[in-house]
């Protein structure tokens, strides 16, 4: 039995749906019936043949601007990757994963110039990424995981500034007046800047000192959190609470707090950011800002494919509200 017979439609309709032909009006119910039939029969369109006909590769490049060590220790990114892959699979696209050295971001431009992908989903944009801006000027379809200020490149993100402000306000409401911060990444990354700005905003509204000595840089890994926390513990006066802008970085920071003989939260309250699956199993369970990693990956992948297919999107970008998840590390 072929897909057309199982779905009770013509072979032309099957071809339109599985090849994502633009400009064809097909109901959502019919589209779902065809995709379900194709899945049941383990049918996959011939990508090489589609490329010859359309000039497209039916592949999107998922670019991760982090080192392999950072990617392998990150509990957040796998959920993003899974979301992108699910969105792509539902539309008959493939995903090409491309880790990029943070100091050589231009390397991913070859994915486009060598005709490997039809568009790029980029996680962790940097303010000084010239290759990204060059591709944007060339009208290459791009979707960012995280906002890039002063550009019109579409993105999916949680309001990181508001989330950081929410996290620090929680600590202020618990009576803390000396609050440190460890960033998720170096401060040339926009995500780190946004979370730092939220930290500062909360302190200023509460008329508390915004001391730069209380901010230490993390770099996506537990090891960076451990070193940053050791440095923060040397600051006078020592903070009684810390906002750590990444749950993964918080793993190392919590270890440093315990090695210093301090108790959480009595001596040092801790709030993280991301709400990775392991956060509720930390010792103690981690108060954190929730990021729907899978949902952001899926939404970004789905929107990118619609852009590739030539759909005019007024809602290409997606900015979600932040949500505080309260656990024992801060109360």
Residue ranges of predicted features:
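Alpha-helical recognition/docking segments in bacterial nutrient-uptake
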Residues: 55-169, 232-234, 238, 248, ...
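N-terminal helix-turn-helix DNA-binding module of bacterial transcription factors
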Residues: 1-58, 331
